[in-house]
């Protein structure tokens, strides 16, 4: 009787089972004898190896991306899928050192060196954060291909992300405005007759995200609340569209309507009627020619108004930060603010509290009188 090799066992009911591993994945074959079981295992090993090689050569990265995306549909948000498509296309269209574009390469042709060259190529036109997002998506796709045994290894494993030496947005143009800056900015906007003035007033009085405001329809506004259902996003080809849902599940929310916010809505709707007619199915806040709000055009307008007002420039997100800052300073509860802002995690809101309190800590510390009437120094 042949000796039973390691990995094989005799089954209680008769016959043999042979367990073996190929590249981290376990397989089993069964036979009536040791010899039959051994032969089946060898044949199965060859089939597995051949299958891996054939699959890796047959599928291009573009083809596998469609398969990967299809498998994720329904388990992740539509807005996430749209963003991943857009980011993937940026990376997939790169041609490094005369080689075919990344998306046209078969899975087994993609090497670590090729991905490094793609990183380098992207630096000519994109920010560090965008490049890192591109490489994160490529890494996730290749990791999925590895799990399906379509490639023998993930060439992006260990690939270092680029270091972003820029200051965090909150330390530059992503900030809250002081009361003096707010007053100067809106005075300049009124004097120059900015088309976007109602939008700025609305953002400041609701804490909405720019994309959420740009996707609001007349039916989303009532006398006592504002319903956030969707946001502006980009399609696969980079075209600006209104998404079918909000940024996240927590982003879909009802905001109590302040009088100033409702006044801004009425002002914008009056302008829309004069310029475009009465269109109930179109967004409230639009571009001067009636299209969807473009971030670049709004940024340009804000920059011009900041220059006219003599204040440091900021982004449209600063209106949201300003609303949140004033809310914290007014004593609004963290949970309430989380719901109004649509933060997915209370930790995000608490970080905002910490940031606001850092700026007011010295003023409040100076106001504390530990020993009434005591000298400044008791040592």
Language-model-derived ranges and their functions:
Residues 26-34, 70-155, 171, 291-297, ...:
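N-terminal core-binding DNA-recognition domain of tyrosine site-specific recombinases/integrases
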Residues 34, 171, 225, 243-267, ...:
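C-terminal catalytic core of Y-nucleophile DNA break-rejoin enzymes
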């Amino acid at each position: 009787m042949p000796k039973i090799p390691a990995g094989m066992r005799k089954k209680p009911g008769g016959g043999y089972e042979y367990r073996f591993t190929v590249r981290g994945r376990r397989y089993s074959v069964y036979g009536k004898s040791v010899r039959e079981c051994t032969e089946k295992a060898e044949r199965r090993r060859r089939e597995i190896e051949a299958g891996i090689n054939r699959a890796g050569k047959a599928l291009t990265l573009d083809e596998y991306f469609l398969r990967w995306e299809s498998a994720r549909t329904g388990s992740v948000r539509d807005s996430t899928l749209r963003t991943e498509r857009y980011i993937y296309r940026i990376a997939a269209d790169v041609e490094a050192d005369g080689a075919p574009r990344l998306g046209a390469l078969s899975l087994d042709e993609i090497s670590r060196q090729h991905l490094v060259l793609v990183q380098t190529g992207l630096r000519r036109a994109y920010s560090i954060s965008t490049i890192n997002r591109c490489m994160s998506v490529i890494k996730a796709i290749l990791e999925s291909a590895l799990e399906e045994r379509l490639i023998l290894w993930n060439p992006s494993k260990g690939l270092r992300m680029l270091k972003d030496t820029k200051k965090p947005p909150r330390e530059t143009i992503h900030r809250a405005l002081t009361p003096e800056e707010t007053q100067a900015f809106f005075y300049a906007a009124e004097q120059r007759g900015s088309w976007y003035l109602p939008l700025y007033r609305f953002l400041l009085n609701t804490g909405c995200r720019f994309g959420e405001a740009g996707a609001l329809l007349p039916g989303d506004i009532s006398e006592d609340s504002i319903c956030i259902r969707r946001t502006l996003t980009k399609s696969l080809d980079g075209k600006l569209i209104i998404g079918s849902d909000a940024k996240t599940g927590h982003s879909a929310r009802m905001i109590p309507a302040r009088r100033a916010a409702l006044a801004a809505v009425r002002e914008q709707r009056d302008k829309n009627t004069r310029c475009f007619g009465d269109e109930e199915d179109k967004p409230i806040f639009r571009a001067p020619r009636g299209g969807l709000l473009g971030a670049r055009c709004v940024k340009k307008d804000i920059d011009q108004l900041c220059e006219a007002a003599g204040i440091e420039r900021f982004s449209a997100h600063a209106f949201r930060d300003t609303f949140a800052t004033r809310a914290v300073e007014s004593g609004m509860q963290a949970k309430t603010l989380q719901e109004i802002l649509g933060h997915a995690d209370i930790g995000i809101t608490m970080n905002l509290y910490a940031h606001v309190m850092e700026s007011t800590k010295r003023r409040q510390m100076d106001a504390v009188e530990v020993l009434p009437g005591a000298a400044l120094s008791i040592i």
